[in-house]
């Protein structure tokens, strides 16, 4: 195997019983000729169709297969995070278990990674998905992510990606953030590129994606943009807003004082209420900013709560 870096293939699995054996055969066919040490980490995300039994049979036959079973269905992002934690090699490749991603593209992704990039993201340029329910929402979401993140990829939702381990270790995932891994990597200084990959129609099982996921993606994108800019300095947001309100409030106070003391106009005007509202809002915003600073500092000084809980693991060096 020489000095070639090892590969960890991480696959979240949710009710893909009929796809697992042909998928593992294709992975073996694609990875064997590379001459690299490798492992295939399957993460069962609460499957109820017998997928775990199929995975155990695969692991019993092939020492490259390592299994992680979550206690219930936590979602794709926690499942991928569990796979990252239990993987061991310097290069990590992710793909779906539905046979729509093609394992034959893995060697190309790894070769593109080389010494020049930290993330190589797959681009399903010619997708085999329904236009209305999958392609249209995907195009809209990808456009918004490109514009808001500044990362010029075409297909953030493609699970087939190759990463250097150190980049994965530098980011934290929650919600539906797995699709933003290239964005997070770029924001921490990672070098990201894109490579066209094959995409096949689903022939077995049912899709876990739908229109509701687009809404979640957009909410996560807005949250991510806010957190990336202000998570370590919340007082820049609340403090700036508070100071602006206080400045306008004092300006309104000057106008009111001029009307009363110079012009002798004693009647109540809406400007008085606007002044009070601005001064109160500005003061409260400053206090909220100070409290947010304290909370954020405490948060970064403590260990984060995990987004998943493992029921059992199986494979080499693991208890079955």
What role is predicted for each listed range?
Residues 2-3, 176, 180-320:
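Hydrophobic helical membrane-anchoring modules
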Residues 44-53, 99-100:
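A conserved acidic beta->alpha catalytic loop
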């Amino acid at each position: 195997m020489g000095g070639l870096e090892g590969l960890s293939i991480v696959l979240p699995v949710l009710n893909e019983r009929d796809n697992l054996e042909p998928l593992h055969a294709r992975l073996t066919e694609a990875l064997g000729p590379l001459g690299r040490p490798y492992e295939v980490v399957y993460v069962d995300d609460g499957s109820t169709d017998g997928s775990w039994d199929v995975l155990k049979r695969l692991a019993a036959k092939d020492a490259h297969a390592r299994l992680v079973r979550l206690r219930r269905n936590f979602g794709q992002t926690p499942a991928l995070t569990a796979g990252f934690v239990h993987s061991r090699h310097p290069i990590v490749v992710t793909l779906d278990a539905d046979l729509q991603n093609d394992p034959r593209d893995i060697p190309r992704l790894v070769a593109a990674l080389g010494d020049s990039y930290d993330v190589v993201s797959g681009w399903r340029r010619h997708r085999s998905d329904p236009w209305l329910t999958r392609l249209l929402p995907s195009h809209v979401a990808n456009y918004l992510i490109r514009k808001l993140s500044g990362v010029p990829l075409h297909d953030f939702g493609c699970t087939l990606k190759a990463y250097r381990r150190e980049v994965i270790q530098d980011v934290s995932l929650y919600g539906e953030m797995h699709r933003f891994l290239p964005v997070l990597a770029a924001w921490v200084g990672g070098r990201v590129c894109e490579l066209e990959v094959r995409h096949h129609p689903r022939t077995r099982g049912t899709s876990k994606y739908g229109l509701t996921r687009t809404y979640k993606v957009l909410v996560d994108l807005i949250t991510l943009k806010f957190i990336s800019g202000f998570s370590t300095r919340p007082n820049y947001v609340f403090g700036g807003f508070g100071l602006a309100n206080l400045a306008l409030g004092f300006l309104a106070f000057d106008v009111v004082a001029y009307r009363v003391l110079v012009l002798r106009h004693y009647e109540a005007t809406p400007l008085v209420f606007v002044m009070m509202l601005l001064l109160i809002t500005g003061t409260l915003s400053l206090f909220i900013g100070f409290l947010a600073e304290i909370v954020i500092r405490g948060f970064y000084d403590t260990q984060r709560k995990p987004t998943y809980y493992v029921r059992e693991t199986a494979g080499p060096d693991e208890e079955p």
